[in-house]
Regions:
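N-terminal Lys/Arg-rich, disordered targeting/topogenic segments
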Residues: 1-25
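Basic/polar, cationic surfaces and motifs that engage anionic cell-wall
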Residues: 2, 21-65, 84, 163-216
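Generic early N-terminus positional signal peaking at residue ~5-7
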Residues: 5-6, 52-53, 71
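Active-site-adjacent loop/helix surface patches within enzyme catalytic domains
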Residues: 56-188
């Protein structure tokens, strides 16, 4: 009887151990889930928050593979109205400048000079390989043609200009613009309804390419 009891107890032991292991499984699953969430958060941070400095000493943020050069217009420029606002829209434009070499860097040089004396500004310019950031996202700018209308394109929208120069790859520019716009919608917790055309605020046929080709 003792031998039988001994074998019975040995046979029962693994079952008890298996039951104990099963009880730990929910904790193990939770730990793995938390590790995955942390990994995703770290990956998002790495993809959207990498910074560097270019040869002109402008800070660079990478939105995916797109380098975004931060070169803000002077705070005392007429084209930088200042103040902060609630961001409600991402407003897409085309530069309407078809001259060869009219890329994002050239438009950055243009806005730096012209915003000093004109009510003229927007937040980003994008071409087929890079982007420039001219006005902080949380400040209004003069890009939508609707003055300082409350909840309008200027007061509540981030203006993004897409380059259309003859030597610029427009399709690649569209891809880069979509990448930047998607990031801005994500960053400011906006839905797709917040993605607007310049035309939506002033009636101007802009973005001319996409509107005339019935792509938007």
């Amino acid at each position: 009887m003792k031998i039988i009891a001994f074998h019975a107890s040995r046979a029962a032991a693994p079952k008890r151990r298996r039951r104990r292991r099963r009880n730990y499984r929910p904790l193990l699953v939770l730990a793995i889930f938390l590790l995955i969430i942390c990994a995703i958060g770290f990956a998002i941070h790495q993809v959207f928050s990498q910074t560097d400095t270019d040869e002109n000493r402008y800070p660079i943020t990478y939105v995916g593979s797109l380098p975004v050069h931060e070169h803000f217009v002077s705070e005392d420029a007429i084209g930088r109205p200042g103040g902060t606002r609630e961001i409600e829209y991402v407003v897409i434009h085309e530069t309407d400048n078809f001259a060869a070499g009219a890329n994002a860097a050239r438009h950055d040089a243009f806005i730096q000079e012209n915003a000093k004396v004109e009510k003229l500004s927007w937040h980003y310019t994008v071409d087929d390989h890079e982007a420039y950031h001219h006005i902080p996202d949380n400040e209004p700018a003069y890009h939508a043609g609707d003055g300082m209308e409350p909840n309008g394109g200027n007061t509540s929208g981030i203006g993004v200009e897409l380059c259309v120069a003859e030597d610029n790859d427009y399709e690649k520019t569209l891809q880069n613009g979509a990448l930047l716009a998607g990031y801005l919608l994500w960053k400011y917790d906006l839905n797709m309804d917040a993605l607007k055309k310049h035309q939506d605020f002033s009636g101007k046929i802009c973005l001319e390419h996409l509107i005339n080709e019935h792509r938007w």
